[in-house]
Structures are given as C-alpha cells and as structure tokens.
Amino acid sequence: RDTEFFEMFRLTRWGLLPVPPREGRSSLIHVDDLARLLLALLPANEEVSHRVYEPDDGRKHGWSHYELARTIGLAMGRRPWVIHLSRASLERIARADRLVRKHKAKLTLDRVGYMTHPDWVVTHGSRPPAGLWRPLIPTREGLKATAQWYRDNNWL
C-alpha cells in the first residue's frame, strides 16, 4: 500500500485536505493495471522492445490536485475542505517539520519540489498501444478499494 497516499486519506477523514498549488496535474494508475502491463511486455518483440511507455488510468489531461482530493473524499464518504497551499507555504512547513522531526521529517524540500511540479501527466502519444494493453480499473474505484483496505486493516 502507498503510504504517501495514506496521509491524504487520513486527513480527509477529518474533513480537511491540504494540497499543492492549483496548477499541478498528474496521471495515476492502479498497481494491478501496471502489473498487467508489465506482464504484457514480457514476451519481448519488435513492437515493444526499446520503447518507453507512460501508462496511466486513461484520463485525458490527468487529475488536478483538487479533483484528486475530492475523489479521495468521495472514496472516504466525505466532502473535504480542499486547501491549496503555495510552494512557499509548503517549503516553510517542510523546514518546520525538519526542525521538529529531524531526519524523520515526512515533508522535505525535495518532496515539496516533487509535489509542486506542474505537470506529472503522461506525454501524449507515449501510452502503450491499445492492442497491447489498456487500463481496466478506474481511479475512482481504485481509491474506493484503497479506502476500504485502510479501514479493514485498521489504518483508519
């Protein structure tokens, strides 16, 4: 289970979800869909050899931070208050986290850079060929199953 996403689910439980700036977008993929793609690539041939694919859930233009936060809220049966934090705010929080938790800080300046990168969406034309693979698990369903797993295993 992705413990980075877990924090988003945990905060959503309290009705509040701070996220990076509005302009960021990202592509997502369910691990089972990714595993199916890796298995489909095993019998290497000219069609797939020496190629770089960028798989995702098939959502054109990816997910905004706000859309992802609201979808996690729906998976949790909540409607969280989504707060966009600026890069400068996230950097201040990261420095404070470092002062308090030292080397165990969860939010680091490196992570802030990663989180605030504006475009983590797959490159147009880089998805795997439809004849080879296509995603089967919608992100909304995957997030709902993840929320249930967290509940069933007493993480939430």
Where are these regions (language model features)?
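Active-site loop of classical SDR/Rossmann-like NAD(P)-dependent oxidoreductases
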Residues: 65, 92, 106-125
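A conserved catalytic-core signature of glycosyltransferases
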Residues: 7, 24, 110
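Mid/C-terminal beta-alpha module of Rossmann-like enzyme folds, strongest
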Residues: 44-107, 137-156
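Flexible, glycine-rich beta-alpha linker
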Residues: 1-7, 16
